[in-house]
Amino acid sequence: MKIGDILRKGVFSISFEFFPPKTEEGERQLFETIRKLEKLNPTFVSVTYGAGGSTRDRTRNIVQKIHEETNLTVMAHLTCIAHTREELIDILQDYKNIGIENILALRGDVPRDKPDWRPPKGACKYAKELVELIRKEFGDWFSIGVASYPEGHPESPNLEWEVKYFKEKVEAGADFSITQMFFVNDYYYRFVEMCKNAGIDISIIPGIMPITNFKQIRKFASLCGATIPQSLIEKLEKVEDKPEEVKKIGIEFAINQCLDLIEHGVPGLHFYTLNKSDATLKIYEAIKDKIPARST
């Protein structure tokens, strides 16, 4: 089932993101998580793709296993900057062959520890170029998602530039978007309003990261430029050495964040699960009565 088609019908989307584990035990734990979250009847799940194509085979194998062993609609992430166009076409053809219809088209991170690193000759240097390549080579076979950044990508000079580039990805053929994680809903609302004013009309699904490990989230937020409210930082700092208290505060914050987003008419919620189900299940349980009807 194509995610873009579902969203265009106005169906409220609930989705979960996973990453491909490095070990057999990690994979066993992932599928334990998937089985628990599958009961929530998500619109789709997605599987990340490592920097520089480092998880190429693992991502592909997990995507195929979810596709074949569950009833879930699965979307494969694909980063382009470290691949030639020929490699990208091979990867996409393989996904088409096994019946995958949804791709999240991303540029991917430039290696921070390799200042002299350059993309391979003929690579797609931007996500927009990957979207164009997919449409050129595969037409409408794939529903294409792209990333969006309510506070601006760390490399963006300003939010106006961010919206302009986002619009280029949409015009290239993107069907929907998932945002980078954020903790201040007003930044999301501002971004969506700017997009509407720029003539962008695809669904922009908020990305939700439940805080269960303060140190880890601080690092993630710093890398992607997401603002954590000072009031939340102060609460978490007081219990930093008490993991269960951190988790409790983080889940409560995410519940309130999601309820506010639902009240403001968002098209869905995308949860960054980090391959764990507990926090997401608790959040869903608390918000489920407020979620709009989800039948297709």
From Swiss-Prot:
Signal peptide (from-to): none
The keyword Membrane is assigned to this record: no
The organism's place on the tree of life at top rank: Bacteria
Cofactor: FAD
UniProt EC number: 1.5.1.54
A molecular function (GO) term: methylenetetrahydrofolate reductase (NADH) activity
Active-site feature positions: 17
Amino acids binding NADH: 48, 180
Swiss-Prot/TrEMBL GO biological process terms: methionine biosynthetic process; tetrahydrofolate interconversion
Pathway(s) per entry: One-carbon metabolism; tetrahydrofolate interconversion; Amino-acid biosynthesis; L-methionine biosynthesis via de novo pathway
GO CC annotation, single: cytosol
Reactions that this protein is recorded to catalyse: (6S)-5-methyl-5,6,7,8-tetrahydrofolate + NAD(+) = (6R)-5,10-methylene-5,6,7,8-tetrahydrofolate + NADH + H(+)
Keywords for the protein's UniProt record, in alphabetical order: Amino-acid biosynthesis, FAD, Flavoprotein, Methionine biosynthesis, NAD, Oxidoreductase
Pfam families associated with the record: MTHFR
Key word rRNA processing present: no
InterPro entries: FAD-linked_oxidoreductase-like (IPR029041), Fadh2_euk (IPR004621), Mehydrof_redctse-like (IPR003171), MTHF_reductase_bac (IPR004620)
Top enzyme category: oxidoreductase
Record-listed FAD binding positions: 49, 51, 77, 107-109, 127, 149, 153, 162, 169
Annotated positions binding (6S)-5-methyl-5,6,7,8-tetrahydrofolate: 109, 180, 216, 276
PANTHER family documented for this protein: METHYLENETETRAHYDROFOLATE REDUCTASE, METHYLENETETRAHYDROFOLATE REDUCTASE (NADPH)
Record family assignment: Belongs to the methylenetetrahydrofolate reductase family.
Function: Catalyzes the NADH-dependent reduction of 5,10-methylenetetrahydrofolate to 5-methyltetrahydrofolate. Is required to provide the methyl group necessary for methionine synthetase to convert homocysteine to methionine; the methyl group is given by 5-methyltetrahydrofolate.
Stated name of the protein: 5,10-methylenetetrahydrofolate reductase
Organism: Aquifex aeolicus (strain VF5)
Taxonomic placement: Bacteria, Pseudomonadati, Aquificota, Aquificia, Aquificales
Gene: metF
